[in-house]
Every structure is written in C-alpha cells, then in structure tokens.
C-alpha cells in the first residue's frame, strides 16, 4: 500500500516551517526538509533555517547534513529522503515534507530517475574554473546554445544553476528543462501525496514579507556568518557560497558593492526566486492552495488546513 505523505510547499517566506511543526504536532508526524540550502551546516541565517526552539521537539530530517564545501546532488537527496520517509512510516508516524526546492519535491512525488544521474564533480570544478577565468557570462552563453529554455529561466549571474543545467546536458544528452516539465511525468506509486501550497493572493504582501526577512537576516549578523565561513576556508566559488544571500555578501566583503547594494540585490533576487517557485508549484495538478492573506490570523489558517488534512488522511 502507498505511504501517505503530506507535502507543504510554496514560495519562500510564507510560513511553511512553522506550519510543518504544527501539522506534525497535530497528526503525530516528523518533518523532512526539501530545501537545497538548509542541507548545509553553519549556514543558518541566510537560509532562514528553523531553530531548535522553533522545532518544538519535533524531529527534523535533511537539515545540517553536509559541509558547505561538499557537493550534494538531487539523486543523493532522493535516496536519503526516501529512506527517511520509509523509516518514519514504519514507526507509525506521518512523514511531512516541507520546502521550496522544486526538484527535491519532484524526486519524491514523480518517477524521475535522478539516481541514474550522479553527475561529475570534475565537470563542475572545470566549469567553475572557466567562470573564474572568463566570467559567468561565458557559461551562460554556452547554456543558451544547448538549452535556451533553461537559460530564459536562469539569471545570467546564477553560476550554481547555470553549471547544474550544463552538467545535466553534458551527462544525459537532454536539457534540464526536459526534467523540469511535470506534464507527462509519472507519479511515484510508492506514495499517496497530500500537497498543501502556501501563498499570498496579494503578491505585494509576499514581497514586503521577503524584504522584512532580508532586513532581519542582516540584523541577525548574516555578514558575520559569511565572514566566519570564509575564515574556515570555504571557497567563495563553492556551490553553497553561490547561494542567494551569500554571494552578495561576499561581493560586499570584497569591496565590489556597498552593504546597501548587497541588501537590495538579495531582496530583488529573493523576490525573483519566489516568483519562480510560484510558477513551479502551480504546475502540480494535485496541490491544494491556501492563501495566507485570506485569513485574519495564522491560527485561523492553521485550523482550516487541519480540517482539510483530517478529511484526507487515512488513520
């Protein structure tokens, strides 16, 4: 019989982590993160990682599992997350997958064959060296040649995603956009997914929330966090340090831009990322959307979601 899983998805800054904890408490569950940046140790502020206090004693998996200089593929995520889901289920608890990384979610709900593609660290290193020598734009032009569809969706300065798209094409012969299309993909029969999407009807409210969150990160010493990571010896060209919120602070520390400019770049980049996430999650035909601004309080939103889940879950 298929394992019932709850997935809580949506753009950044919509309150997914908080809701996941409440759902876990109400329905006897454990949380599995589906966030490609929260897997990294020591990167807490810039990734808006849930704190021990916020977890309220609920076990959280797939957080703080790799060093910032380590590579971590979707195939690796799929393998580990599926083993954890199985274990949670076998212990009689509800697996709750929460996060905004679309490919991580896809690796669970669809048959993706990610595990057939491990990629190549050598290839990624070679691409990073080319970017250091000729600039990110050189690789972006290459991507436009082999996968114009992916190039349209990826920002010209997003080195991490550019390299990933080139790598997929290099080793599978197919563009990454091929793997990102949900139409025609087969659902994974191992799972019976109940997917909840959190969003705002008023996009401006979401953008304001994002801006406030970035200001909070700066207040909570994001700059210091990046300084410490660089001191430990993590390379500014490493996968993790190319992440949104980190690469801009590195630019500031290198004297390339002011702190104000770095903050604005993070806000703009995060708003753009949220837009991409919304587009991605709208493609799921089995998602049930809940709009935060439809409710007067968080408690009202939470109770509505509890009611919906109670009608769907098989106890």
UniProtKB/Swiss-Prot annotation:
One of its GO terms (biological process) is tRNA modification. The keyword Isomerase does not apply. The record marks 101, 124 as: Interaction with substrate tRNA. It is an enzyme of class 2 (transferase). ATP binds at residues 10-17. It comes from the Bacteria. Catalyzes the transfer of a dimethylallyl group onto the adenine at position 37 in tRNAs that read codons beginning with uridine, leading to the formation of N6-(dimethylallyl)adenosine (i(6)A). Belongs to the IPP transferase family. This is tRNA dimethylallyltransferase. The gene is miaA.
């Amino acid at each position: 019989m298929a394992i019932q899983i709850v997935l809580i998805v949506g753009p950044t800054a919509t309150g997914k982590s908080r809701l996941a904890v409440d759902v876990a408490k109400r329905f006897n569950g454990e949380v599995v993160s589906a966030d490609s940046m929260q897997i990294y140790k020591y990167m807490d502020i810039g990734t808006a990682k849930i704190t021990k206090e916020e977890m309220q004693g609920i076990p959280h998996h797939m957080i703080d599992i790799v060093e910032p200089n380590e590579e971590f593929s979707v195939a690796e995520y799929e393998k580990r997350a599926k083993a954890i889901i199985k274990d949670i289920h076998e212990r009689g608890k509800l697996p709750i997958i929460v996060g905004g990384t679309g490919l991580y979610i896809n690796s669970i709900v669809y048959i993706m064959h990610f595990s057939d593609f491990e990629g190549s660290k050598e290839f990624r290193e070679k691409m990073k060296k080319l970017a250091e020598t000729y600039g990110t734009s050189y690789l972006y032009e290459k991507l436009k040649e082999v996968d114009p569809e992916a190039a349209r969706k990826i920002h010209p300065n997003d080195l991490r995603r550019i390299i990933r798209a080139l790598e997929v094409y290099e080793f599978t012969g197919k563009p990454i956009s091929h793997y990102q299309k949900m139409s025609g993909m087969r659902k994974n029969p191992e799972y019976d997914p109940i997917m909840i999407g959190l969003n705002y009807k008023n996009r401006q409210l979401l953008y304001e929330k994002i801006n406030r969150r970035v200001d909070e990160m700066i207040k909570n010493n994001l700059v210091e966090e990046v300084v410490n990571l660089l001191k430990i010896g993590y390379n500014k060209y490493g996968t993790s340090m190319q992440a949104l919120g980190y690469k801009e602070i590195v630019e500031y520390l290198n004297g390339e831009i002011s702190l104000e400019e770095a903050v604005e770049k993070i806000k703009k980049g995060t708003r753009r990322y949220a837009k991409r996430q919304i587009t991605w999650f709208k493609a799921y035909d089995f998602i049930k959307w809940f709009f935060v601004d439809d409710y007067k309080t968080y408690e009202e939103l939470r109770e509505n979601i509890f009611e919906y889940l109670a009608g769907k879950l098989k106890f």
